[in-house]
């Protein structure tokens, strides 16, 4: 079985390049899998001989190449269609349809303006706006950059947690970034030090799983806010995070997806 790992373009891994590479290496290591950058022109040639592809790719070209591999019967994780569905505005619709709690548009503590078409590539793609004037300026900046697909969400006080999961396995973990200080852009500091409010871990896992299922994205991560009364909302959801806080466990769970796919494939 030939296993290939497709590394996402570096612009999609801001401040996380090595962490993203590390999880991909951990996943493909037992098979001595080859890792290739999604923008490498030789990607189609490599995919032509692959049996299993673990992909973090996000560019349209790479996703099209992976579509073709899927049509040939190659197991691709995450599926390219799932990655496309992880655009923020698409996820918002899927979350509402799947009864997954998300922030309202209006609140009393400011707003977050988020680029909706692709994952954040820089700090300028996710902007905190403390008042209406700041929101108007941020919207004008988006328009000047040609960004007309965006999401506006109210900022909600509470504990910020990061969660990580792999569908069809027992793997689901969450962490408080305020405890260890790990951060991509530093936005987590807006919610301050965590209070570790009590909440239903089962319900959080269930909500994240519903969204991952709707998005067809089995390898996922995201952020949630826990309020003092234990209510939570999902504020972000990502295809294949770095899993840096739980890399070994995550890699094992991701590999389980291949075994499950093989078990469900009809034998000739």
Cite the ranges covered by each PLM segment:
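Conserved N-proximal alpha/beta basic substrate-recognition cap immediately N-terminal to
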Residues: 8-104
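Short, solvent-exposed loop/turn segments at secondary-structure junctions
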Residues: 10-11, 59-60, 82-84, 118-119, ...
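Phosphate-binding site of ATP-dependent enzymes
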Residues: 129-215
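A long amphipathic alpha-helix within ATP-dependent nucleotide-binding catalytic cores
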Residues: 183-234, 238, 246, 253-267
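A short beta-strand motif that forms the metal-chelation/ATP-contact edge
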Residues: 50-54, 114, 163-165, 230-245
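Active-site nucleotide/adenylate-binding loops and adjacent lid/helix of ATP-dependent enzymes
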Residues: 2-10, 71, 81-160, 198-202
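Anionic group-transfer/hydrolysis microenvironments
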Residues: 116, 155-156, 164, 223-225, ...
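Short glycine-/acidic-enriched loop or helix-start segments at secondary-structure transitions
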Residues: 15, 63-66, 88, 122-124, ...
